[in-house]
Amino acid sequence: MNIQDLPFLPVYFDRYITQIPGDLELQDAFEQFAPEVIFSDTDLLLQLGDQVYAPGKWTAKDILQHCIDTERIMTYRALCISRGETISLPGFEENLYAQNTVAATRTVEDLLDEYNTVRLATRMLFQHMSEAMMLRTGSANNAPITPLAIAYMILGHAVHHKNVLVERYYPLLTSNGV
């Protein structure tokens, strides 16, 4: 299955889903957009340290933790919907979650190890869903969504944050003479 099989693009998450080529089959997308591929520039992440491009913004480690947390939450939503859950699953406040982690005390390598482990579980969940399960419509944060859309949202969300790092964080390294 691929993005073209989606019965609709969910509001808000479309900006993440469209980061992934529409004809890319889901399991191929999981390979092409694996954390170790998207965030393969570990040296740059390490060089960034705790630098941020503006006051109040997250560090690179905060971004990795956010991607991990979001993937876990989205995977839970996909599991619930695929199994027939009918209640609207709750949203979450990403900044509150970011304030309540220990990402600052962790290494980039440790975060990437966790991310890869979470991704393996995510991939296995979607690999063993039927087409009907993938296309079942449920509700999250009071908006309709399908597990297939969630899968591509997870991948596109990581791409989005990689782009933020490239566009806003990595230039800090050259401006600081690193």
Regions found by a protein language model. Give the residues of each.
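Acidic/histidine-rich alpha-helical segments that form the ligand environment
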Residues: 28-42, 97-135, 154
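Amphipathic, non-membrane alpha-helical segments in soluble helical-bundle scaffolds
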Residues: 20-30, 57-64, 105-115, 148-151
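Phenylalanine-focused residue identity feature
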Residues: 8, 13, 30-33, 39, ...
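Terminal targeting/low-complexity segments that flank the catalytic cores of oxidoreductases
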Residues: 1-32
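Short, contiguous, helix-prone interaction/anchoring segments in small proteins
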Residues: 21-56
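Short, contiguous alpha-helical
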Residues: 1-10, 47-94, 135-178
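A short small-residue
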Residues: 12-17, 95-103
